[in-house]
Regions:
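Positively charged, amphipathic and often flexible ligand-engagement surfaces
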Residues: 1-221
Length: 221
């Protein structure tokens, strides 16, 4: 990741690098942290090492004025990922927006979590970096929930997800002075399906906060 950041820093057409926490930390460790289970001493040391590696990446992003997108992953490890993302934002999102967390809006709890993340960022004096997407693990999430007998974290239908996505988008735009917004693949769907709704959002004109739109290559058609 650090080499990727160095490459991006030398190329004005690459403003951001994406990272998956599961590429740095063991899945089982993240799951245990998300469950709130006490870690064994060797696991504490392992997690400390993970945080140091992630901090080194985010520090490099800050120094090179490049941004890091922290991907969202499965719901049963997401609490640990969110905790890491918030920690890194609190360190590196004060003078420059270096770190973005990803919010999968197909989860019915993500709108509330987005608002809580905004409140936490305000209280701690940093800018929330928010990348909004719909989500990528829908079948896996529903299957696991059914097999293990707990309520699915996924919205009941696409319309509900669209509502959550659009409400989250409006919230971020309404608070653009304190939220650095990235829209993933959802921008295309909003542009195609909700032209009037999207056009009704306020115009963003601020040099301080960088609001961007991106398109994931596989769905570019």
């Amino acid at each position: 990741n650090i080499k990727a950041l160095e490459f991006a820093a030398a190329n004005p057409f690459i403003p951001v690098v994406t990272t998956k926490i599961t590429g740095i930390a063991r899945f089982d460790l993240l799951e245990k942290i998300s469950l709130g289970v006490d870690l064994a001493p060797e696991e504490e040391a392992e997690y400390s090492s993970v945080l140091k590696r992630i901090d080194a990446i985010c520090s490099a992003a800050y120094k090179t004025k490049t941004s890091i997108f922290i991907d969202a992953e499965e719901s049963w490890i997401q609490d640990a990922i969110d905790s890491i993302a918030n920690l890194m934002m609190s360190r590196y999102n004060k003078e420059y927006i270096s770190v973005y967390n990803t919010f999968q809006m197909y989860r019915h709890d993500r709108l509330e979590f987005l608002m809580k993340s905004y409140e936490e960022a305000n209280n701690q004096g940093y800018i929330l970096g928010a990348k909004l997407v719909r989500g990528a693990y829908i079948d896996k999430e529903r299957k696991r929930a059914e097999e293990r007998g707990y309520p699915s974290p996924i919205n009941k239908d696409k319309a509900s997800t669209d509502d959550c996505f659009n409400t989250a988008l409006r919230f971020c735009i309404d608070n653009y002075e304190k939220i650095a917004l990235i829209l993933g693949e959802g921008f295309v769907k909003i542009r195609q399906n909700n032209k009037i709704e999207f056009a009704s959002f306020k115009t963003i004109e601020t040099p301080e906060i960088d609001n961007q739109f991106e398109l994931i290559y596989p769905i570019s058609d």
